[in-house]
Design a protein with these regions (language model features):
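Solvent-exposed alpha-helices and their adjacent loops that cap or buttress functional pockets
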Residues: 1, 14-18, 59-63, 86-87
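A short core secondary-structure module
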Residues: 1-49
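Short intrinsically disordered, low-complexity coil segments enriched in acidic
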Residues: 1-10, 54-59, 159
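Structural motif
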Residues: 3-5, 22-23, 50, 68-69, ...
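Cytochrome P450 core scaffold surrounding the K-helix E-X-X-R motif
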Residues: 35, 80-86
Length: 194
């Protein structure tokens, strides 16, 4: 990405806890690979800025990486403060709102994982022959595949409802609920598919 969302302490009074944090958009060069190291020309403090990032290993996230980022003397212009002057001290609130979207995204990703597991299990059930019949002909296999399909559809529809709520500025609690439900369902579906 060409930008980072950076939650930074803007009030040195640590007794303000999360109320002393602000959220900034920080531009950076596009990096190649799973780590990066950049320097920035001397900024307002007349010091060369440094930014270094390394990917954090995560299970199941392909095409999307989490990074540990270290900044030293990296200059960010005041206009990059989210919420302009009214955003000072509100960064934590803004960040939490962003996490709500992340919860919905995690639920949607889990629906995709369940769908892929179901399709693999269905293919296996149709092609694995035991005692002269595909195992998909047996009642227990049919019941498991049926339950998988129900959980997938329920998770998908729940995610759609929450997405509509969030588009209307609602659904913070429901975003947490759909993530919890769909991820738990995905555990069962993928376990049974194996």
């Amino acid at each position: 990405a060409d930008v980072l969302a950076l939650l930074a302490r803007t009030d040195p009074d640590r007794s303000k806890t999360h109320r002393g944090l602000s959220l900034f958009i920080v531009t950076k060069p596009r990096g190649g690979g799973h780590g990066f190291q950049f320097t920035q020309e001397a900024g307002a403090a007349d010091r060369v800025g440094k930014m270094e990032g390394r990917a954090i290993d995560t299970i199941g996230y392909r095409g999307m990486h989490s990074y540990e980022v270290a900044l030293e003397d990296w200059w960010v212009p005041a206009e990059n403060l989210i919420g302009e002057q009214d955003g000072i001290g509100k960064g934590f609130i803004f960040q939490m709102a962003g996490f709500e979207n992340g919860r919905l995204q995690t639920a949607a990703r889990a629906v995709g994982v369940m769908q892929a597991a179901y399709e693999a299990a269905l293919d296996y059930a149709q092609n694995r022959v035991v005692f002269g019949n595909p195992i998909g002909d047996y009642q227990l296999t049919q019941a498991k595949l049926g339950r998988m399909a129900v959980l997938i559809q329920a998770g998908r529809q729940f995610a759609y409802v929450v997405a509509r709520m969030m588009a209307n500025g609602e659904g913070a609690t429901e975003a947490a609920m759909v993530k919890a439900y769909v991820c738990k369902a995905a555990e069962w579906v993928t376990g049974e598919a194996m």
